Structure formats: structure tokens, C-alpha cells
Amino acid sequence: MGQENSKCPHQSLAEKRYKVERPKTKKVSSGSATERCLSTQSDEKNAARRLTVSSCDVSAEDDLPEIKKLSVCEPNEDEATSMTNAAAAAGGAKSKCKHFLTRRERILLEQSWRKTRKTGADHIGSKIFFMVLTAQPDIKAIFGLEKIPTGRLKYDPRFRQHALVYTKTLDFVIRNLDYPGKLEVYFENLGKRHVAMQGRGFEPGYWETFAECMTQAAVEWEANRQRPTLGAWRNLISCIISFMRRGFDEENGKKKQYSYNVQGFSSNRARRSISPYAPGVH
């Protein structure tokens, strides 16, 4: 009876007098309980995946070697793609870098890189890293090279290891020029990792040193012959430094906010402990 009355098409007296409209009920999907359970499980798996895509763990198959002292690593292709997709799903600003290089610039960079690699992979990273340490000798302490004379740097195994990271990073960039979101996510994470290096002397002003040395290295290996190619390198390096700086500033801001909250919590506890209304205080 109750169900039949609820489905009655006739209007009640209150509806006629006050012209009250009946609320429209939504139809419930007729899917089985098994289908609903499967969809719930898939949603939980996707949520767990979204929570873990921001990690930057290195496996044995990664292109860049892990340097634990600096916490610098390159995410593999699948991981970088997952992080990019998660950022796009979250509605972040990751899609704004879609066209930071033109198609022509990407072609020029790929051609330049192929030509430059003929001189030897180690030579490229070694040139950039040596220029950085020469321009800013204080940076040597960050990498544990402060006691190595400038003339002996290129023979030090630690220098060679870090120089190889520069080379492999550039190779990773060139291979992923068609995936700007992947590059942005990687270099933002790399910038965040530099926050921990402040305790060893890293300063935000070093970003400019990195940019200038990388640009100067490109000028030297191009020998000023191809102005459009040099312009493409400048644009690429500018974007890389911009992504790293943004990640660094974001992580540094979170760290400062956390320290402020912890200090505020500690001071509040201290004030409560000396309150005149506390038990045992006369």
C-alpha cells in the first residue's frame, strides 16, 4: 500500500494550494553487486596508485645512476609518465608547458645532440661540471670535492661520476622532448631534492650558475655556427632551470611552514606548562 500511494500521480491538497513540485528521484543503476564491488576495488587501486606516483625510487634498469649523497635520480619512463598523468588528473599546472619548445627547436636540439655525442659521452658532462665548479668554487664542497685541486678534478672518480649524471640527464631530456610534462615533473622533483642540500652549502643563486655554464657549453660545442640551435638550447635550459627552481621554492616553503608550526606548537606547550593555574603551582 505504501509503495502504491507513493507512486500516485494525483496531486495532494498541499501541492495544489502551494504548487509544490515533487522532487525528481534519480534512477539507481541496475548493476549487480559483483560489478559494483569490482568497480570499488578498481577505484581503491587507482587511488593507491595516485598516492605513490610522486616517489622517485631508482631501479636497476634506470638510465641515471643513483648518487645517494645528493639524492639525485632519474625516474624510469613508466614512472615519469605515471607522475605526469597523476598531475594532469589533479588539475595542476602541469599542462601549461606543452609548447615551451617549437617543433623546429626540438629537431635542432636532437640533431645537435647526436653530433655532440660523437665527441664522447663523458666529455659533455665533464665540460659542464668543470665549468660549474670553476665559476663557483664553493660548489665543490657540496659534492665533497673541496680538497681536490682544480687541475686534478677531471681525474677524480667522484667528479667523473657526477659528470656522467650531467650527460645522462641531458640524454634523458633529448629523448623526451616530445613529452614536456614528463620533463617538468622530473625537474621539479629534482629541484625539491636540492632543498636538503642547503645544509651542505647550496644557495638558490647557484641556479644561475648552472644555467650560464650549460648555455656556455652549448655555445662551445656548436662553435657559434648555428644561431637557431643556440637559441633552442637557451630556451630548453631556461625551462629546465625554471622547473627546478619552482620545485625548490615549493618544497622550501613547505619546510619553513612545517618548522614554523612545530615551533609554535612547542611554544604553546611551554606556556601551558608554566601557567599559574596549573596544578601544584602556588
From Swiss-Prot:
Keywords: Heme, Iron, Metal-binding, Oxygen transport, Transport
Domain called Globin: residue spans: 100-249
Superkingdom of the source species: Eukaryota
Amino acid composition bias (Polar residues), ranges on this chain: 28-41
GO MF terms held by the record: heme binding; metal ion binding; oxygen binding; oxygen carrier activity
Residues the entry annotates as binding heme b: H162, H194
Name of a matching Pfam family: Globin
Biased composition (Basic and acidic residues): 13-23
Induction: Induced by paraquat, a chemical causing production of reactive oxygen species (ROS).
UniProt-annotated stretches for the region Disordered: 1-46
Family annotation (InterPro entries): Globin, Globin-like_sf, Globin/Proto, Mb-like_M, Oxidative_stress_globin-like
Gene3D superfamilies: Globins
Task performed by this protein: Involved in oxidative stress resistance.
Family: Belongs to the globin family.
Record protein name field: Globin-related protein glb-13
Natural source organism: Caenorhabditis elegans
Name of the gene: glb-13
